[in-house]
Amino acid sequence: MEDKELITNATQLLSELNKIFQSCKQGMADDIRLQELLNTTLQELKKAEKLDNSILIDLEKFYQRTSLLIGLGSLKLNDQARTAWRNYDKFHYEHVKHVLTLYGPVFGF
């Protein structure tokens, strides 16, 4: 996948998740956190002219934090929002994880 295509696809999937999420928000703290994560990540993607590691790190931060909110937090998604999240989850594992470059000490087990 080309750099610009990856940014475009990520923006499209996150915009879709954001749009669907608007219908199931309950105003709880985790809902607000997810909305802030979506807003900041979408802003960074819109500013991005080319794909670099900082964009990939932003996507990874969004992914990790949202996974925690969905898995361990009090965030409740309806079926449509959960499907939109699973679509982004699949995209993230197929196109972001293997391109992300880690620096510093990394321990593999």
Task: Describe each PLM feature range.
Residues 1-39, 96-109:
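Short terminal alpha-helical segments
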Residues 3-6, 10, 48, 52-55, ...:
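Intrinsic-disorder-associated interaction segments
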Residues 24-72:
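Amphipathic alpha-helical interaction modules
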Residues 66-109:
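Amphipathic alpha-helical binding modules
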Residues 10, 29, 48, 81-84:
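A sequence-composition feature that detects small, non-aromatic residues
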Residues 16, 20, 62, 84-87:
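Residues that form generic nucleotide/phosphate-binding pockets
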Residues 12, 52-61, 81-82, 103-108:
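Generic hydrophobic segment detector
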